[in-house]
Amino acid sequence: NSLRVDYLSNVKLEDSTPRFDELRAELDRMQSKMWGVSVKRNKWGNDHLEHVEFTIKIEDNEEYIVRRLEREKRIGTVEKLDEHTYRFSADVYDTSEMIPWIRTFICRIDKMNFSNRTIENQFKKDLEAMYRMYGIRQEVPQ
């Protein structure tokens, strides 16, 4: 069950839960896979992770893009593939939470691979629509 904090109108302070340390440890473990607040679990309560991977290309004088990628990523890794190519990859609970951030690398993304194909396909359709709308002749990343 989820509850929006902005809908709460009355809060009463009571004793702390005896499970606080256990719950805090569980949150700490889960945060290494959380981009935002969403957590997906299967019907047995086990974590359901999605893999996100994209490759960007930079020019000679664009190291600041790599620094930005490293600085802004909340989780995951950045791997240098060659002088101009870098790969970001992460296992997350919800790929869709990352899309606004990934969009900021449009026109630099060379390849992408999301285990959640629905999100990947929607991202590509959105790019195609944007390219058509602005008359940009660029291929959508594969």
Which residues fall in each region the model found?
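Polybasic (Lys/Arg-rich)
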Residues: 32-142
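Core beta-strand-centered patch of the WYL/Sm-like small regulatory domain
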Residues: 1-55
